[in-house]
Design a protein with these regions (language model features):
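Mature N-terminal segment immediately following signal peptide/propeptide cleavage
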Residues: 12-14, 46
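Extracytoplasmic "Venus flytrap"
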Residues: 14-31, 52-56
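A structural preference for short, hydrophobic beta-strand core positions in alpha/beta folds
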Residues: 47-51, 174
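Short, hydrophobic alpha-helical packing/hinge segments within bilobed ligand-binding/sensory domains
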Residues: 58-62, 180
Length: 180
């Protein structure tokens, strides 16, 4: 049998993120993804990581990929709730699924198909590349004993959690994790 014709061309892709390069867990995870892609391709596809603010600001990562400024982004889909209300389902949700449950839903429960449909509307393709676990609640200067205690509180929380805090009378701030 003849050998298949395989292109010997090398590719260089840019990966933008919504966090600092060495941000524990998320930033280091993004670097691991970039390094793994480069290694699995024997260096034919080199992925250079750009931390939030290096190529584009954190909250411009989605549009940077759509506009061709970068080939990929490592981010948290709840940041894109203003683009479509369904994006937070593909990320951590306060009181939501565990990492194992979320992975099972995406890989075996139809989640990836829904995500493909959602991202296809934007000309993008998404896949899981790490996880931070269930979105934490908050750390507050005063004790929270009831739902009424949320009134007047200002906290950093994106996605569905932000909607809940706002409806309870608090003020949610959508801020990249690296800017806290």
């Amino acid at each position: 049998f003849p050998s298949p014709a395989i292109s010997q061309e090398n590719f260089r892709w840019k990966m933008v993120t919504t966090w600092p390069k060495n941000f524990p867990g998320l930033g280091t995870g993004a670097q691991r993804v970039a390094d793994s892609i480069t290694a699995m391709s024997d260096g034919r596809l080199t992925v250079k990581l750009y931390a939030a603010g290096e190529l584009v600001p954190a909250f411009e990562a989605f549009d940077a990929v759509r506009e061709g400024k970068a080939e990929m982004s490592h981010d948290a889909s709840y940041y894109w709730v203003a683009k479509h209300k369904a994006f937070p389902f593909f990320c951590t949700v306060p009181g939501g699924l565990t990492v194992q449950e979320h992975n099972a839903w995406v890989y075996y429960g139809g989640g990836q198909e829904l995500w493909d449909q959602l991202c296809g509307d934007f000309g993008l393709r998404a896949f899981l590349a790490g996880g931070s676990g269930i979105q934490m609640g908050g750390w507050f200067q005063k004790e929270i004993l009831s739902a009424d205690d949320i009134r007047g509180i200002k906290m950093r929380i994106p996605g569905f959690g932000a909607e809940v805090i706002n409806r309870m009378g608090g003020t949610a701030v959508n801020l990249p994790g690296g800017e806290i």
